[in-house]
């Protein structure tokens, strides 16, 4: 096993890797930019190395600086995390050529997956299911009609040199094909100057289901079951879970075998994820292999009990999967769900936020609640990097229990400072499609307007009542303390806001829906008046 590694990343994933290393007795070296000089991943490492200015292009994407830091620190290996250089074959190759271990797949495997079109050709040749289609140069209309019938309907006609949604038509029957082909070719010719088209089976309302795989130096490849990531917004994952509520034992066996076959076909080593698109009838097709650890890996850890980062480290150090994970298929327990807490504004097209985290209250962790974060209260969310605050992962004996645990955990989460998506996530997990698991990759985009409906404001009388309750509790606690003092009648032992020469005044603050609400309680004769300090319209009330 390694004695020291460098983590070529920042934020949440760097902190996550450090936790496994700390438990295994491995020293860690952090790299940091100007903006991250006091970041959590730097404070949590055994040592740190500055690698450049704040923009990623001047720091976390500077492979030569990161490699120099690794060599200078005496690290034996480099863990790339996810994002940045994690899937850069040249970086992986440079690390190995420098005499260090790259904690991930080989550069050769990465290059084979670098082209999505090339990857599909390779997978098809290996026997992994890919979406049927036609990509040939021959554009004779009669040939295209025959190919369409071979591919099957519904299918999609796509401009070969297009993009941006132009030159695309969904065709649901043979009778529609000729007219749709002509229309698509005209649009492609006008938009791109070329009218060549491709044909591809159209999978309606698909699910995104992926399999976690691992390979080792002996050539062994295994899978650790599936995760479902169908709740997406513009192809960005929002909620991930394991096991998939859609996958039964038969489908799991078939997809798992295909995932292992995909890994073996490119001599895969270390952690990877084989992504599939799955139709409503259970037909599944290869999409791509992510050649790194995934953001959503904790849901697999929660249901298998395995530490995937530890597995990465041990496999990179030469240990074999047969010894590390002897039981196949890997047994799972219960249900896990992950959501990502972001500094972003869902009501403003999910615009990323930045600024100081004035207040950050996260749920208490337990066997059923896990938090993977890279910031704490008082830290800055900068404009330079992904605005993730934390990943919230929950576990329950079944999906219903896990959703209930997630609802409780989100209710206990408070973010004051930059806008966050906490309230959006609370509404999302209560949506009928999520509760019933009747989702597909387009669900969230279709239903976004409904989920973004802002709930009615809390009535002013309720806010005033909350303030009254807090004041009464404060007075009751003060009375208990006063009785314990030598002089129970001392004005210093009373919580009535008494001030010499001025009316009594007490301030109370509450966090609600990412707002800091402040109330002032003014002492009157035999009563107290409560005023909302920062409201546009004051909330007023009195109590005797």
Task: Name every feature range the model reports, one short phrase each.
Residues 259, 298-543:
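Catalytic cores of soluble metabolic enzymes centered on carboxylation/carboxyl-transfer
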């Amino acid at each position: 096993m390694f004695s020291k590694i460098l983590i070529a990343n920042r934020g949440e994933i760097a902190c996550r890797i450090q936790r496994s290393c700390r438990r295994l007795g491995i020293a860690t070296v952090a790299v940091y930019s100007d903006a991250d000089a006091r970041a959590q991943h730097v404070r949590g490492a055994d040592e740190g190395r500055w690698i450049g200015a704040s923009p990623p292009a001047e720091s976390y994407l500077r492979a030569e600086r990161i490699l120099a830091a690794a060599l200078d620190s005496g690290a034996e290996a480099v863990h790339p995390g996810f994002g940045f250089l994690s899937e850069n074959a040249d970086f992986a190759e440079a690390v190995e050529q420098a005499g260090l271990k790259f904690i991930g797949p080989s550069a050769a495997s990465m290059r084979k997956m670098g082209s999505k079109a090339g990857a599909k050709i390779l997978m098809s040749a290996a026997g992994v299911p890919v979406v049927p289609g036609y990509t040939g140069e021959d554009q004779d209309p009669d040939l295209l009609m025959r190919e369409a019938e071979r591919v099957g309907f519904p299918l999609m006609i796509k401009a070969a040199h297009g993009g941006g949604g132009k030159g695309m038509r969904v065709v649901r029957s043979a009778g529609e094909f000729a007219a749709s082909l002509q229309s698509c070719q005209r649009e492609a010719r006008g938009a791109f100057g070329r009218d060549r088209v491709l044909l591809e089976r159209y999978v309606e309302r698909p699910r995104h289901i992926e399999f976690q795989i691992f390979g080792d130096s002996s050539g062994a490849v295994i899978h650790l079951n599936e995760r479902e990531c169908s709740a997406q917004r513009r192809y960005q994952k929002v909620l991930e879970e394991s096991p998939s509520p859609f996958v039964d034992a038969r489908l799991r066996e078939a997809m798992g075998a295909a995932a292992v076959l995909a890994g073996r076909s490119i001599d895969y080593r270390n952690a990877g994820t084989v992504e599939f698109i799955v139709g409503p009838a259970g037909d599944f097709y290869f999409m791509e292999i992510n050649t790194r650890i995934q953001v959503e890996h904790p849901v697999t850890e929660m249901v298998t009990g395995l530490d995937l980062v530890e597995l990465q480290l041990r496999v990179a150090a030469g240990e074999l999967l047969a010894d590390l994970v002897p039981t196949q298929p890997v047994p799972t327990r219960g249900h896990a769900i992950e959501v990502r807490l972001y500094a972003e504004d869902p009501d403003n097209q999910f615009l990323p936020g930045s600024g100081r985290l004035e207040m950050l209250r996260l749920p208490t962790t337990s066997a059923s609640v896990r938090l993977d974060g890279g910031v704490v209260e008082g830290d800055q969310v900068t404009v330079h990097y992904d605005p993730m605050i934390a990943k919230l992962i929950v576990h329950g004996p079944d999906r219903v229990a896990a959703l209930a645990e997630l609802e409780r955990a989100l209710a206990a989460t408070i973010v004051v400072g930059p806008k966050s998506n906490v309230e959006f996530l609370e509404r999302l997990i209560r949506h009928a499609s999520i509760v019933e698991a009747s989702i597909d990759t387009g669900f969230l985009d279709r239903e976004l307007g409904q989920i973004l409906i802002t709930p009615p404001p809390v009535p002013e009388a309720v806010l005033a009542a909350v303030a009254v309750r807090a004041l009464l509790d404060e007075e009751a606690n003060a009375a208990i303390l006063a009785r314990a003092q030598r002089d129970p009648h001392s004005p210093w032992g009373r919580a009535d806001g008494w001030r010499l020469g001025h009316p009594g005044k007490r301030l109370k603050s509450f966090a609600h829906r990412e707002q800091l609400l402040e109330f002032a309680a003014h002492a009157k004769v035999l009563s107290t008046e409560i005023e909302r300090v920062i409201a546009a319209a004051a909330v007023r009330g009195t109590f005797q």
